[in-house]
Amino acid sequence: MLLPEIDEKATVKRCKRKLREYPRWREIAHDSAEQKITQEFTFMPRGGSGVNKPVENIAVRRVDALSELEAIEQAVNGLYRPDYRRILIEKYLAYPPQPNWKIAQAIGFERTAFQELLKHSILAFAELYRNGQLVVER
């Protein structure tokens, strides 16, 4: 069986979008329930289509966020090449994220060679994230 042909440009775009979500998922996963729940007194009846369950909503969002964080971290940590892991961690997972030139300088690559290495690390991530869910085939 031959490997399917991958649309690299679309796959890289999807992966970058997913990796850029990481800080948001981290914030959601570590939100405090105390910050979200406040008592409000009003004489107006509640509107909407159902009962508001803020504690349940927070718990569900936190579980979803933890699941997403785990999937991203598992894919990054599963990369075979240490330089791929380092690039993705420093660029997308670390706070604050490092600019490309700084990462390239730290690992000893020229800017153009680094861009190619970044692309390959992102494509490798795509294959590992949730069994290739981010891969776009032609």
Swiss-Prot record:
Taxonomic classification: Viruses, Duplodnaviria, Heunggongvirae, Uroviricota, Caudoviricetes
Domain of life: Viruses
Functional summary from the UniProt entry: May be involved in the regulation of muramidase export.
Protein's recorded name: Putative autolysin regulatory protein ArpU
Alphabetical keyword list: Transport
Organism: Streptococcus phage O1205
UniProt gene name: arpU
